[in-house]
């Protein structure tokens, strides 16, 4: 047990000694000394100044290393995200469309297109007069709900529908005259 304590004590003294007498290999450390490297240093302030400089250099270098490491990690994360986006997110986009409301909008557009085609076919066939009771239409417009649960009581929509119906009634009732 004594030998372990002795070895630990020698190790601590060795480490402490190496911290106090750092080798001056680089030009930066050599420039910080006013005396030449061969002359012994007798001023304790100069030793402390050297120690502070080497600690600051280590801290600065370590900070630069950590910054570059964070940048590398971030770039790696971006690359992995992009790589995963191509495989997984395409399946997720189909479900996301409905959540965004574009799917509902596409269905509404399709249904409106179908109604327009049916109406044009009805006009071309020229079958009987179709009446549009306006009181029922207004009540129907006010009571209709959208997929998100909100009422469609916007006056612009109602007025546009009424104007369209009036125009269609005018077209149906007007006689076509041929000018030759």
Curated annotation (Swiss-Prot):
Signal peptide residues on this chain, from the entry's feature table: 1-20
Region (Disordered): 23-59
One cellular-component annotation, GO: plasma membrane
Subcellular location: Secreted
BP GO annotations: adenylate cyclase-activating G protein-coupled receptor signaling pathway; adenylate cyclase-modulating G protein-coupled receptor signaling pathway; cellular response to glucagon stimulus; gluconeogenesis; glucose homeostasis; negative regulation of apoptotic process; negative regulation of appetite; negative regulation of execution phase of apoptosis
Tissue expression per record: Glucagon is secreted in the A cells of the islets of Langerhans. GLP-1, GLP-2, oxyntomodulin and glicentin are secreted from enteroendocrine cells throughout the gastrointestinal tract.
InterPro entries found in the cross-reference section: Glucagon, Glucagon_GIP_secretin_VIP
Entry coiled-coil feature ranges: none
Record-annotated site: Cleavage: 52-53, 83-84, 91-92, 97-98, 130-131, 145-146
Pfam families in the record: Hormone_2 (PF00123)
Propeptide intervals in chain numbering: 84-89, 131-145
Chief location bin: secreted
Keywords for the protein's UniProt record, in alphabetical order: Amidation, Cleavage on pair of basic residues, Hormone, Phosphoprotein, Secreted, Signal
Positions carrying Phosphoserine: 54, 105, 108, 150, 152
MF (Gene Ontology): glucagon receptor binding; hormone activity; identical protein binding; receptor ligand activity
Arginine amide PTM sites in chain numbering: 127
Similarity annotation: Belongs to the glucagon family.
Entry function: Oxyntomodulin significantly reduces food intake.
The name this protein goes by in its record: Pro-glucagon
Protein encoded by which gene: Gcg
């Amino acid at each position: 047990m004594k030998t372990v304590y002795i070895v630990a004590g020698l190790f601590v003294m060795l480490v402490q000694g190496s911290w106090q007498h750092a080798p001056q290999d680089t030009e930066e450390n050599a420039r910080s000394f006013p005396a030449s490297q061969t002359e012994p240093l007798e001023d304790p302030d100069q030793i402390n100044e050297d120690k502070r400089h080497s600690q600051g250099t280590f801290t600065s270098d370590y900070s630069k290393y950590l910054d570059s490491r964070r940048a590398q990690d971030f770039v790696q994360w971006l690359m992995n995200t992009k790589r995963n986006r191509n495989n997984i997110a395409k399946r997720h986009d189909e479900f996301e469309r409905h959540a965004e409301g574009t799917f509902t909008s596409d269905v509404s557009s399709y249904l409106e297109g179908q109604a327009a085609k049916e109406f044009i076919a009805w006009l071309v066939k020229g079958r009987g007069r179709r009446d549009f009771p306006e009181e029922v239409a207004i009540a129907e417009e006010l009571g209709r709900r959208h997929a998100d649960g909100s009422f469609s009581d916007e006056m612009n929509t109602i007025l546009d529908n009424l104007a369209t119906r009036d125009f269609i009634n005018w077209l149906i009732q007007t006689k076509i005259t041929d000018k030759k």
